[in-house]
From Swiss-Prot:
<feature type="disulfide bond">
    <location>
        <begin position="19"/>
        <end position="25"/>
    </location>
</feature>
<dbReference type="Pfam" id="PF08023">
    <property type="entry name" value="Antimicrobial_2"/>
</dbReference>
<keyword id="KW-1015">Disulfide bond</keyword>
<comment type="similarity">
    <text>Belongs to the frog skin active peptide (FSAP) family. Ranatuerin subfamily.</text>
</comment>
<keyword id="KW-0044">Antibiotic</keyword>
<dbReference type="GO" id="GO:0050829">
    <property type="term" value="P:defense response to Gram-negative bacterium"/>
</dbReference>
<keyword id="KW-0878">Amphibian defense peptide</keyword>
<dbReference type="InterPro" id="IPR012521">
    <property type="entry name" value="Antimicrobial_frog_2"/>
</dbReference>
<dbReference type="GO" id="GO:0031640">
    <property type="term" value="P:killing of cells of another organism"/>
</dbReference>
<keyword id="KW-0295">Fungicide</keyword>
<dbReference type="GO" id="GO:0050832">
    <property type="term" value="P:defense response to fungus"/>
</dbReference>
<protein>
    <recommendedName>
        <fullName>Ranatuerin-1C</fullName>
    </recommendedName>
</protein>
<comment type="function">
    <text>Antibacterial activity against Gram-positive bacterium S.aureus (MIC=55 uM) and Gram-negative bacterium E.coli (MIC=1.5 uM). Has activity against C.albicans (MIC=58 uM).</text>
</comment>
<keyword id="KW-0929">Antimicrobial</keyword>
<keyword id="KW-0964">Secreted</keyword>
<dbReference type="GO" id="GO:0005576">
    <property type="term" value="C:extracellular region"/>
</dbReference>
Length: 25
């Protein structure tokens, strides 16, 4: 469903942000 897709994109987005902040990519 669209909602689950948005949730998954949100998780990926947060992961990328945390990666950039922590610089542990």
């Amino acid at each position: 469903s669209m909602l689950s897709v948005l949730k998954n994109l949100g998780k990926v987005g947060l992961g990328l942000v945390a990666c950039k902040i922590n610089k542990q990519c």
